A protein has these predicted regions:
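Long, low-complexity intrinsically disordered regions
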Residues: 256-278
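Eukaryotic extended alpha-helical scaffolding/oligomerization regions
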Residues: 2-261
Length: 278
C-alpha cells in the first residue's frame, strides 16, 4: 500500500494535527464529531443531571480518543487553514469543492460554540436560581433551625441536598470538560488568526486571485468571531465555577446545621427517656 504523502502545512504548529487528520481520513477512521444536537439546551441539561456521576458528559465527546495525539478542534482548524492556503495560492484542484468542505468545517466549529454557549448560559441560570432559593433559609437562620427540629423536615433537607450535590458534581464535570475543549479551540484559533494576518501583508494572491478577497474577509470574520466566543466561554466558565462553589458551601452549611439539630434532638430524647425511668 502506497504511503500517504502529507503536504507541508502553512502553519507549522498545525502540521501534526493536519497529518493526523489526513491519516485518519485515508484509513477511513475519521471519528464522527458530535453534531449540534437537535434537542434543546434544557433537554441536554436534564439528560446530564439524570445521568450517574461517573458517566461521560456531552462535552467529553470532543476529547482525544485512544491513539490520537491532537484535539479535534485543532484538526478542524488545520483543515480550514489549509483550505484557505490552497484557495489563496490558486493550487486547489476544484475551488468550489474546497469551499464546500470549508463551509462544512466552519459549521462544525460554529455548532460546537453555539451548543456550549447555550449549555453554559442555562447552567448559570439554573445554579443562580438554586443559589437564590437556598440562601433564603440561611438568611432566616433562627426560623430554619426551629424548623429543623422536625424530623421529617430534616429528612427532606438532607435528601434534597444529596440531589443538589449530584447536580453540582455533574455541572462541574461538564464545565471542566467543555473548558478543556474551549482552551484547545482558542489556541488553534490564535494560530489561524496569526496566519491570516500574515497573508494580509502578502500582495501576490491579491493580484493573482482578487476573487478570493471575499473568501479571505469571510474567514477573517469567522476567526474573530470564534476568538470572542471562546473568550466569552472562559468568562462564563469562571463565573459558573464560582457560583458552584457558593452553592456547595450553602449545602454544606445546611447539612451541618441539620446534623447538629439531629444530635441535639437525640440527646433531648435520651434525657427524657432517662427521666421517665425515675
Amino acid at each position: 500500500m502506497k504511503e500517504l504523502q502529507v503536504p507541508i502545512h502553512p502553519i507549522s504548529s498545525m502540521q501534526g494535527a493536519f497529518a493526523e487528520s489526513m491519516l485518519e481520513a485515508s484509513a477511513g477512521s475519521s471519528p464522527i464529531l458530535p453534531q449540534s444536537e437537535s434537542t434543546s439546551a434544557a433537554s441536554r441539561r436534564q439528560k446530564l443531571l439524570d445521568q450517574a456521576i461517573e458517566e461521560d458528559t456531552h462535552a467529553s465527546k470532543w476529547r482525544q480518543r485512544p491513539g490520537q495525539r491532537y484535539h479535534e478542534l485543532w484538526k478542524l482548524m488545520a483543515q480550514i487553514s489549509f483550505g484557505i492556503y490552497l484557495l489563496l495560492n490558486g493550487i486547489a484542484k476544484d475551488d468550489e469543492q474546497v469551499l464546500n468542505i470549508l463551509q462544512g468545517h466552519v459549521d462544525e466549529v460554529d455548532a460546537f460554540l453555539e451548543t456550549t454557549l447555550e449549555d453554559f448560559d442555562l447552567a448559570i441560570k439554573d445554579i443562580q436560581e438554586r443559589l437564590k432559593f437556598l440562601k433564603m433559609p440561611l438568611e432566616n437562620i433562627h426560623i430554619f433551625d426551629a424548623m429543623l427540629e422536625d424530623r421529617q423536615f430534616r429528612l427532606q433537607i438532607v435528601t434534597g441536598n444529596e440531589r443538589i450535590e449530584h447536580i453540582i458534581h455533574r455541572t462541574a464535570s461538564a464545565m471542566k470538560d467543555a473548558l478543556k475543549d474551549v482552551q484547545q479551540g482558542l489556541d488553534a484559533t490564535k494560530e489561524f488568526a496569526i496566519y491570516l494576518a500574515e497573508e494580509l501583508e502578502e500582495p501576490d494572491w491579491k493580484m493573482s486571485r482578487p476573487d478570493m478577497q471575499k473568501v479571505y474577509d469571510a474567514m477573517k470574520g469567522n476567526a474573530e468571531g470564534w476568538y470572542k466566543a471562546y473568550v466569552a466561554l472562559q468568562t462564563k466558565g469562571n463565573h459558573l465555577g464560582e457560583i458552584l462553589v457558593q452553592l456547595g458551601s450553602i449545602v454544606a452549611e445546611m447539612d451541618k446545621r441539620a446534623g447538629k439539630i439531629s444530635r441535639k434532638m437525640r440527646v433531648r430524647i435520651l434525657c427524657l427517656h432517662v427521666r421517665s425511668q425515675y
